[in-house]
């Protein structure tokens, strides 16, 4: 369904510098216009009206935002934070159900999608703080008092980090297959040690961003996404029969690698967090309820919910498993996911 309004074409793309980023537009068949068109295709089947706008924050940056049912004033708004390599368009299967009786906001994280793509610090703690402050500035700009904050993957990590720093703004924290919670296990403690060749490959790739290969592939990048992740087309088959989803993912991830670089600076080899959230979540304000949603078929460690419960013994923590779902639980089983999220939201108001 078409948006009700759009104030400007898009958020700024941020700085481009160096020979590589200057060369990318001529090698990769992409542009901000391509990303805009891909997003519009993702959203055209959303069965409800919405408004979209770039929300201005500090340093000239903008956060690309969708607003659903924003005129409902008696319910706490639900705010959706996407994961690494994603964008707000990936919630297309969820918007219609989630906004039936409360405001829903979704935005592209700073450095991702159609939000600004600034330079991030190289220090993991400072990068995390830059993300958190961008969320807080976004909240202030929209005049939201309190939120139900839901994050998937990297978005879950950032939602938890935000809740630690700004507890008075979060009425409920919903972690969906969150990244970055456990510490990296010692190699000697692993049941199946990482093969030497994988460790060598990991060391060789350390200087590069996680999705650099997609940009290096240039005009072959889109077919690479389609070949490596055919599951995304299947997940959204009820909404799209063509390659809309893989095209959106491709154009999200071959722009200037701003958020991607930030994520790399927050990780150690093999994708573990430099600053694991389980080391800190016990310090979260005890009055913030936490719900953890994971897919029963996910390859990601699903024990974070149990760990959070043990670290917050006197606070509300609930773990919910979605049968038949993997890591992208909101797309694998959207109806069940939407229902569980609505039930959680109804406990707030």
Swiss-Prot record:
Domain comment as written in the entry: The HXXXXD motif is essential for acyltransferase activity and may constitute the binding site for the phosphate moiety of the glycerol-3-phosphate.
GO cellular component: cytosol; intracellular membrane-bounded organelle; lipid droplet; mitochondrion; nucleoplasm
Keywords, alphabetical: Acetylation, Acyltransferase, Cataract, Cytoplasm, Deafness, Differentiation, Disease variant, Fatty acid metabolism, Ichthyosis, Lipid biosynthesis, Lipid droplet, Lipid metabolism, Phospholipid biosynthesis, Phospholipid metabolism, Phosphoprotein, Transferase
GO annotation terms (biological process): cell differentiation; fatty acid metabolic process; lipid homeostasis; negative regulation of triglyceride storage; phosphatidic acid biosynthetic process; positive regulation of triglyceride catabolic process
Domain AB hydrolase-1: from-to ranges: 77-184
Catalytic activities: a 1-acyl-sn-glycero-3-phosphate + an acyl-CoA = a 1,2-diacyl-sn-glycero-3-phosphate + CoA; 1-(9Z-octadecenoyl)-sn-glycero-3-phosphate + hexadecanoyl-CoA = 1-(9Z)-octadecenoyl-2-hexadecanoyl-sn-glycero-3-phosphate + CoA; 1-(9Z-octadecenoyl)-sn-glycero-3-phosphate + octadecanoyl-CoA = 1-(9Z-octadecenoyl)-2-octadecanoyl-sn-glycero-3-phosphate + CoA; 1-(9Z-octadecenoyl)-sn-glycero-3-phosphate + (9Z)-octadecenoyl-CoA = 1,2-di-(9Z-octadecenoyl)-sn-glycero-3-phosphate + CoA
Protein name per UniProt: 1-acylglycerol-3-phosphate O-acyltransferase ABHD5
Family per similarity comment: Belongs to the peptidase S33 family. ABHD4/ABHD5 subfamily.
InterPro entries: AB_hydrolase_1, AB_hydrolase_fold
Effect of residue 130 to P: In CDS; loss of PNPLA2-dependent triacylclycerol hydrolysis but no effect on LPA acyltransferase activity
Motif HXXXXD motif mapped to chain: 327-332
Physiological role: Coenzyme A-dependent lysophosphatidic acid acyltransferase that catalyzes the transfer of an acyl group on a lysophosphatidic acid. Functions preferentially with 1-oleoyl-lysophosphatidic acid followed by 1-palmitoyl-lysophosphatidic acid, 1-stearoyl-lysophosphatidic acid and 1-arachidonoyl-lysophosphatidic acid as lipid acceptor. Functions preferentially with arachidonoyl-CoA followed by oleoyl-CoA as acyl group donors. Functions in phosphatidic acid biosynthesis. May regulate the cellular storage of triacylglycerol through activation of the phospholipase PNPLA2.
Protein's cellular compartments: Cytoplasm; Lipid droplet; Cytoplasm, Cytosol
Enzyme Commission number, as recorded: 2.3.1.51
Induction context: Up-regulated upon keratinocyte differentiation (at protein level).
Entry annotated with the keyword Transferase: yes
